[in-house]
Amino acid sequence: MRKIAAGLFVSLDGVVEAPETWTGPYFNDQVGQAVGAMMASNDAMLLGRTTYEGFAAAFGGQSGGMADQMNNTPKFVVSSTLTSADWQNSTLISGNVAEQVRELKQRPGRNIGMSGSSTLVNWLLRHGLLDQLDLLVFPVVVGAGKRLFSEPDGRVPLTLTGSESFSTGVVHLSYQPAA
């Protein structure tokens, strides 16, 4: 069975919003290699609407390097408001999301990766559908912005499965739901 693996940039105070404004000073080759390794284990992406729209605007119609990878990767978009997902290789998921995600996990292939989409990550985690949570914790207090766990929906125990630190102070933490 395929796993759903989410990778997120998070500040020390839990902010995940607009990482492009606060990760720069800490992003080095080590962090880039960690991100690359996470992406290499995936052959599809699961995205929420907001992340999908941002990625489609950034990469759709572009070519070369990361744009080719993003455009060619199958993307599954969870949304209750979109009526279509027109970016290349995108499929809309609406209605019974849990059932459709379970079906995706049954298909052959490598991991289904997630980048951003913190609302969807939270929902999947709380519904037992997220298999791996990789957090790249940046040594900065942002102060304001959307937080990874901002909804008081109860406790979800996790098990630390790996950790590594980088020379810029970034720490990569890998978790799975506790058994």
Question: Where are these predicted regions, by residue range?
Answer:
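Portal/gating segments that form or line small-molecule/metal binding sites
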Residues: 1-129, 139-179
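Non-cysteine beta-strand/loop elements that form the S-adenosyl-L-methionine
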Residues: 136
